[in-house]
Structure formats: C-alpha cells, structure tokens
C-alpha cells in the first residue's frame, strides 16, 4: 500500500484557517463555529471586519504579513508569510523546519470565494470596473491550497461551510476529502480564468475583423441533471449548463411532467429554434429533430397549431411542440387531446397549464427566446467545429433580394408563402424540400441523400394538397428532376438558392412547366 493510500482515511485536524470571501453568505456561522472549535482565524479586509463586528476573534492579515493593504486593496495576501503557510507540505520535515526558522505558521484550512467578475460584466459595467473585479489574490490562495491538498483543505463556495464545521467537530478532513475539495477548487479557478480570458478576447483585444472566429475558445459547463439515458438506453447522458450563455433550453423552467430525456432536449431545441425563425405567430412540431409540421397564422396560436398538426398528424403523435407565442386556452385544449412529449413556449395564458396538465406525463417548459446570433460548437473526433449560427440573416433571406429566373412575378400571397417556405427549410435536415400552402407546411421531404428523393417524399406527404402549392429547396437543384417532380405534382412556384452549373437547364424546366422560379443566392444546409 502506498503512503498516499494509507493516509486516505486519516484526518488532519484544523487548527488555523485563512478566510477571505466576497460573498459573505454563511460567513458568521462559519467563523463562530471555527472559533468555538478552537481554530485560529486569519482574515482580510472586509471579511475580517465582518467577523470582528460580531465579536468573533480574528487576526487581520496585515498582522501576519507586517505589511498593510496597498493599491486600493489590490495587494493584501500576496506575501511569503501567507503563501509559505499555504504551500508548506507538512509531511516533509524540511518544510516544517523552514517554517519554524521563518516564524511562519501553516494553514490547515482556506476559505475563499472570488470577486464577482462575470456578474460585473453582465451588469453592463465599464471596462475599468470590470478589470477591478478580476481577482488576483483570491485565485492565488485557492490554487496554492489546492496544490498542497495533502496538508490543506480548501473551500470555495458557501454551500461547503456545513461540511467544514462537521469536519472540525470530527477531527478534520481526510486526505480523500481534501482531494475532492482541491479538484473543486481548481475547477472554480478554471471557470473564473475562462470567463476573464473570454471577456478580454472579445472586449479588450478582439481578433482582427477578418478573423471573425476566435483563435482560442474556452468554455465551462456544469452538470445540471443526470438523464435516464442518452439517445438509446445503453448510453449514459447528462444535461450541462453554461452559466454565461444566453438562457436557452438548458435553463428552461419545467412547469409539469416527467423529467426531460436526452431526446426530449434535442427535439425541443430544434422545435424552439424553428418556431422563432418566423416573425408571425408560429407553431413547430418536431420529431427526431425534423419537422412534422410548421405553420404561421395571423389569427391565433391555436390556428397555427391546427395547421401545423394537419401537415402530418401521424408523425406528430408523440412529437414536441414549440411556439413563439403565448399558449392559449384554446390551443391547450387541442394539445391535451394529442399525445405530446413536450411543449415549450415563452408564456402560457391563465388556465392553459392546468388544461395541459391533464396529461400526467407531458413536459411543459417555459423558456426564453433563443439567440438569433452567436456561434455553435459541434464536437468531432479529436476536436470540434465552430460556426456562426445560421440566423436567416443573409441577403438572400429577404425576398426583396431574390431574382425571378422565370415565370410571372408572384402575387403578395404567393410571395408570402414562398418566404415562409424558405425560412422553414432551415429547420429541415438536408437534403430538404418543403411544400407549403396557406402559411403551413403540407409536405416535408427531409434528410435524403439526393434532392429528387426529397422532392418525391415531400410530394408523397402532401398528397392532394400539393396542387396549387409552392415549394422551397434548402440548396440548389443540381438537375431538373427534383424540380420536375414538384411541378408535375402541381406546384405553381418554387424558390431555391441557384448556383448550380446546370441552373440554365433547371430554369428551362421551370419555364416549360409554366411556374415562377425564384433564386435566393443563399443556402441553408442542416446536418
């Protein structure tokens, strides 16, 4: 058995503690408990004052260092009399001897939490104010104590104070416990450093304009929930949250229902984004990350849901519903009669949640509007891919910039349907063809490895509704066969990016069919 293993269960008594905290939550109870257990407390600045004001004995750090706070408090603990007491490995006789010669006492416990840098940035504070909240001494003490975990226990959050007092009463922390605390401490400083580095890179020293994506990417995520399983029962899964991110599905409030699954989250995220791709009242129904139906309405959210559901009622069974509008009582009454896994919305009218809750298992989520800009990460073997979010903000996403390749200009109603179809394509896995009528998808061809099969699938799903409808393709038609599949079924107008070396042949096929064909010059692949 190694010495490390042999000491894992041995406790190290806590006789001397260093406390320096910005967040004073629980501080007095902690200090009082330590004092009553006979622990000597050394503390800094406002922390020492807070403790002393309650009549608890405390030694100000300047009494230990023999040096006052300077530079508006920027230098308090950066001193050998502090850091030698933190870094001395008391298992080593030579370290103990060195401390004795210098008249330095070791610390057994360090309790530190850091300046609120991220909160200051989020408050809209000035650059100088944010810089002042970059903690230097705090992380230095935390890292020193965590490195020296064989001799020192370190606690970085108030929710750990009860554990400190329990340890003091029972003889201290074991080595195994100190290792866990050290790991949490380094995680804490890593999160802090990533926040500072990311802010500096984006605010103080941004990349050159030509370099729109950063040379360095840092991020931290904390586990928020352990999920039952992943995409399949044999896969483990968990939900992690980014505390600095725009509040998204990971931060949604669940108002009712069973716990969310991995697949629930992926489908809800796809549905949520699809619904907010449109300015009008919109409902999107998603299954396996693809739309069963998307619809907009100028009448009501219930009308939008009815139209979206009618696109493919069979596939919508067990689907995920999202809307960019408040869920009405009328919509809730309809949804309550349909097997639905998840519904997510920015608001619910009074009574709507109660109606939906008739279904015991339906998951009802309240979520903030998703971001329209930013970047997306996708892990790959050995690294990750980063791209700008496809936000439907290209020039070609505005019908004003479309080119009429052939046929008569579309009337306002047809053009509105073409715009809706084009924006709906973004939510469909490529190759994607969407057939639309009256502000609703009536046929969706998704995820096919060639475009003609996507067109066939969209026509098949639309059935008789395809006659007189319009269609959109997320990428250009490489051959006329996909377009011909749509026109032969009765589609009267089509929008696609264009850009194929055979654009002229495709346009000729459209002209022959007597339809209007628009080119966007933009593309919306989704993989």
Swiss-Prot record:
Q: What EC number(s) are associated with this protein in UniProt?
A: 2.1.2.3, 3.5.4.10
Q: Which keywords, in A-to-Z order, does the entry hold?
A: Hydrolase, Multifunctional enzyme, Purine biosynthesis, Transferase
PROSITE patterns in alphabetical order: MGS
**A Pfam family it matches:** AICARFT_IMPCHas
**Catalytic activities:** (6R)-10-formyltetrahydrofolate + 5-amino-1-(5-phospho-beta-D-ribosyl)imidazole-4-carboxamide = 5-formamido-1-(5-phospho-D-ribosyl)imidazole-4-carboxamide + (6S)-5,6,7,8-tetrahydrofolate; IMP + H2O = 5-formamido-1-(5-phospho-D-ribosyl)imidazole-4-carboxamide
MGS-like domain segment(s) = 8-156
Q: Report TM segments.
A: none
Q: Which GO terms describe its cellular component?
A: cytosol
* InterPro entries with a match to the protein in the record: AICAR_Tfase_dup_dom_sf, Cytidine_deaminase-like, MGS-like_dom, MGS-like_dom_sf, PurH-like
The protein's GO terms of the molecular function aspect are: IMP cyclohydrolase activity; phosphoribosylaminoimidazolecarboxamide formyltransferase activity
For biological process, the GO terms are: 'de novo' IMP biosynthetic process
Please name the pathway: Purine metabolism; IMP biosynthesis via de novo pathway; 5-formamido-1-(5-phospho-D-ribosyl)imidazole-4-carboxamide from 5-amino-1-(5-phospho-D-ribosyl)imidazole-4-carboxamide (10-formyl THF route): step 1/1; Purine metabolism; IMP biosynthesis via de novo pathway; IMP from 5-formamido-1-(5-phospho-D-ribosyl)imidazole-4-carboxamide: step 1/1
UniProt lists the family membership as follows: Belongs to the PurH family.
HAMAP family, from UniProt? PurH
* UniProt domain comment: The IMP cyclohydrolase activity resides in the N-terminal region.
The cross-references to NCBIfam families, in alphabetical order and at most eight, read: PRK00881.1, purH
Question: What name is this protein filed under?
Answer: Bifunctional purine biosynthesis protein PurH
């Amino acid at each position: 058995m190694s010495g490390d293993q042999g000491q894992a269960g041995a406790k190290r008594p806590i006789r001397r503690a260093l406390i320096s905290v910005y967040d004073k939550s629980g501080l007095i109870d902690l200090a009082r408990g330590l004092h009553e257990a006979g622990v000597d407390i050394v503390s800094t600045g406002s922390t020492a004052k807070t403790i002393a004001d309650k009549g608890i004995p405390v030694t100000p750090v300047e009494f230990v260092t023999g040096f006052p706070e300077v530079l508006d408090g920027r230098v308090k603990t950066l001193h050998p009399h502090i850091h030698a007491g933190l870094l001395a490995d008391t298992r080593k006789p030579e370290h103990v001897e060195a401390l004795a010669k210098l008249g330095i006492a070791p610390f057994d416990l360090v309790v530190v939490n850091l300046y609120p840098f991220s909160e200051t940035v989020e408050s809209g504070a000035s650059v100088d104010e944010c810089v002042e909240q970059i903690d230097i001494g705090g992380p230095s003490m935390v890292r020193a104590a965590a490195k020296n975990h064989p001799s020192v226990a370190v606690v970085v959050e108030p929710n750990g104070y009860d554990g400190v007092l329990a340890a003091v009463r029972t003889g201290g922390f074991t080595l195994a416990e100190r290792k866990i605390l050290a790991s949490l401490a380094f995680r804490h400083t890593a999160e802090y450093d990533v926040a500072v580095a990311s802010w500096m890179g984006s605010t103080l020293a941004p990349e050159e304009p030509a370099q729109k994506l950063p040379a360095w990417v840092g991020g931290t995520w904390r586990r928020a929930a352990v999920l039952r399983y992943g995409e399949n029962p044999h896969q483990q899964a968990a939900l992690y949250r980014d505390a600095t991110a725009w509040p998204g599905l990971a931060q949604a409030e669940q108002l009712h229902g069973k716990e969310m699954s991995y697949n629930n989250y992926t489908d809800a995220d796809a549905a949520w984004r699809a619904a907010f791709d449109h300015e009008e009242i919109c409902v999107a129904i998603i299954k396996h990350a693809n739309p069963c139906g998307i619809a907009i309405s100028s009448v009501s959210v219930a009308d939008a849901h009815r139209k979206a559901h009618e696109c493919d009622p069979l596939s919508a069974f067990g689907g995920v519903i999202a809307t960019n509008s408040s869920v009405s009582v009328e919509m809730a009454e309809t949804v309550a009669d349909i097997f639905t896994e998840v519904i997510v919305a920015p608001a619910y009218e009074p009574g709507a949640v109660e109606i939906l809750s008739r279904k015991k298992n339906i998951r009802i989520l309240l979520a903030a509007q998703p971001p329209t800009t930013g970047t997306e990460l996708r892990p790959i073997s050995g690294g990750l891919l980063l791209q700008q979010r496809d936000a439907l903000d290209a020039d070609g996403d505005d019908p004003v910039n479309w080119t009429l390749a052939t046929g008569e200009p579309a009337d306002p109603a047809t053009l509105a349907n073409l715009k809706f179809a084009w924006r709906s394509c973004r939510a469909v896995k490529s190759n994607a063809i969407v057939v639309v009528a009256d502000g609703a998808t009536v046929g969706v061809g998704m995820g096919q490895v060639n475009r003609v099969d996507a067109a066939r699938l969209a026509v098949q799903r639309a059935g008789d509704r395809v006659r007189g409808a319009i269609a959109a393709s997320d990428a250009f038609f490489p051959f006329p066969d996909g377009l011909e599949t749509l026109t032969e079924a009765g589609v009267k107008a089509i929008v696609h990016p264009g850009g194929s070396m055979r654009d002229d042949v495709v346009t000729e096929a459209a002209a022959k069919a007597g339809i209007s064909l628009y080119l966007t010059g933009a593309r919306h692949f989704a993989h």
